[in-house]
């Protein structure tokens, strides 16, 4: 484990963690039903989505299904730093490859962000869905967020985007859920839950499954194993891989 991964953990137990739903409805079932109704009524192409490349493959897969139904413009936020070309990679997102393979992020991650900002400015984008990012740091200002009819955000800690949101859905840290990532070498690796979510927070894949069903009518698996296996059947890069096959070492796929 790198030093950043070993030492950067205290935020998980931060006193500022988002632990309750913010919005007109504050119970999960009612909030998701309300959001689903809003999305069903949204004209095609009037919704955009920014989903972090720190989300799991399973979460990104469900978000992609939602985006396809809504004809939503999507992207992820590139996150780069210093690399040593040996052990430390310059890409600081743990799942950039997953976001690209699943289709949330374009090949040039971040290239759709200016288009989303312009769409909000022009009024063609009226609803924005954000998972795990503070978009005010990547060209979508708080003023632009104020122009939206609906801003739906899921995150772990408060930021300027959660402050502007009409709905905030509290998500989980990696240690509080299960899922998988695709690393820089193309190895699909799974991780396991070792602590309970804070307050009323839920694993994103769990409530996304409910939301996708409410919006699209497409039911799916309610276990992480079944969800991964369903994704592997639909996303070409993952075909032939199963959750069980990942084991402790993972499985390498073609990038």
Describe the function of each predicted region.
Residues 48-56, 133-136:
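Conserved short loop/turn motifs at secondary-structure junctions
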Residues 16, 26, 30-32, 41-42, ...:
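Non-catalytic alpha/beta scaffold blocks inside enzyme catalytic domains
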Residues 1-41, 45-51:
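Catalytic P-loop NTP-binding/switch module of NTPases
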Residues 9, 56-57:
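Short, acidic Gly/Pro/Ser/Thr-rich loop/turn segments
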Residues 241-255:
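Acidic, Ser/Thr-rich low-complexity intrinsically disordered segments
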């Amino acid at each position: 484990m790198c030093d950043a991964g070993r030492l950067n953990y205290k935020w998980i137990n931060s006193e500022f963690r988002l632990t309750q739903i913010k919005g007109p409805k504050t119970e999960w079932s009612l909030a998701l039903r309300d959001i689903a109704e809003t999305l069903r009524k949204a004209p095609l192409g009037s919704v955009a989505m920014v989903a972090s490349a720190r989300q799991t493959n399973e979460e990104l897969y469900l978000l992609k299904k939602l985006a396809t139904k809504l004809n939503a413009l999507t992207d992820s936020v590139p996150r780069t730093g210093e690399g040593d070309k040996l052990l430390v990679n310059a890409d600081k997102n743990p799942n950039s490859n997953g976001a690209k393979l699943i289709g949330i992020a374009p090949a040039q991650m971040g290239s759709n962000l200016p288009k989303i900002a312009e769409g909000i400015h022009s009024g063609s984008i009226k609803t924005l869905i954000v998972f795990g990012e503070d978009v005010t740091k990547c060209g979508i200002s708080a003023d632009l967020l104020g122009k939206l009819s609906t801003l739906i955000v899921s995150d772990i800690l408060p930021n300027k985007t959660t402050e502007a949101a009409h709905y905030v859905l509290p998500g989980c840290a990696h240690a509080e859920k299960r899922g998988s990532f695709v690393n820089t070498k193309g190895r699909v690796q799974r991780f396991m839950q070792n602590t309970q979510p804070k307050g009323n927070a839920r694993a994103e894949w769990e409530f996304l499954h409910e939301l996708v069903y409410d919006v699209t009518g497409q039911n799916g698996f309610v276990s992480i194993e079944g969800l991964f296996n369903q994704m592997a059947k639909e996303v070409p890069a993952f075909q032939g891989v199963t959750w069980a096959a990942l084991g402790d070492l993972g499985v390498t796929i073609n990038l």
